């Protein structure tokens, strides 16, 4: 009789442990899903902000480019113009990443592609802001 109770209690303990493990796995998977959703939301917000910044920069760069095109340029201004043209191409490639980097992204999974574009945006926006500030400073210096 004792043996039957020991087996029954052992079975109950084992089934309770299995249920707790199953519940823990489910809660972990739910937590992973929630974390992924929040990451997607943050990326969406970041993408919208970055899109606005890119649009503003492109407008400022086009204005600067038209200013430089209309007047005579020194060698330094010519170099700045070349840099602005390069930056414009890079910003356009951010708007159309499928066309611009199709060769780069073959064989990568989606996460690697997202990381690649994030790194590319950071690599481009840092120098762009410096270049725009230098160009605006030079333009204001020439005007004033």
From Swiss-Prot:
GO terms for cellular component: extracellular region. The modification Isoleucine amide is found at residue 143. It comes from the Eukaryota. It holds the Pfam family Bombinin. Keywords: Amidation, Amphibian defense peptide, Antibiotic, Antimicrobial, Cleavage on pair of basic residues, Cytolysis, Fungicide, Hemolysis, Secreted, Signal. Residues 1-18 form the signal peptide. It is found in: Secreted. InterPro entries: Bombinin. Residues 19-43, 74-123 form a propeptide. The modification Asparagine amide is found at residue 70. The keyword Nucleotide-binding does not apply. Its main location: secreted. GO terms for biological process: defense response to bacterium; defense response to fungus; killing of cells of another organism. Expressed by the skin glands. Maximin-2 shows antibacterial activity against both Gram-positive and Gram-negative bacteria. It also shows antimicrobial activity against the fungus C.albicans, but not against A.flavus nor P.uticale. It has little hemolytic activity. Belongs to the bombinin family. This is Maximins 2/H8 type 1. It comes from Bombina maxima (Giant fire-bellied toad).
């Amino acid at each position: 009789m004792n043996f039957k109770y020991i087996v029954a209690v052992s079975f109950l303990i084992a089934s309770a442990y299995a249920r707790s493990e199953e519940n823990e796995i489910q809660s972990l998977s739910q937590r992973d899903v929630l974390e992924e959703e929040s990451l997607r939301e943050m990326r969406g917000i970041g993408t919208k902000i970055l899109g606005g910044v890119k649009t503003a920069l492109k407008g400022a760069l086009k204005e600067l480019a038209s200013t430089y095109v209309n007047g005579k340029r020194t060698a330094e201004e010519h170099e700045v113009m070349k840099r602005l043209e390069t930056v414009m191409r890079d910003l356009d490639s951010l708007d159309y990443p499928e066309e611009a980097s199709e060769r780069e992204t073959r064989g990568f999974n989606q996460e690697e592609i997202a990381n690649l574009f994030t790194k590319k945006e950071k690599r481009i926006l840092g120098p762009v802001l410096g270049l725009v500030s230098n160009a605006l400073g030079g333009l204001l210096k020439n005007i004033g």
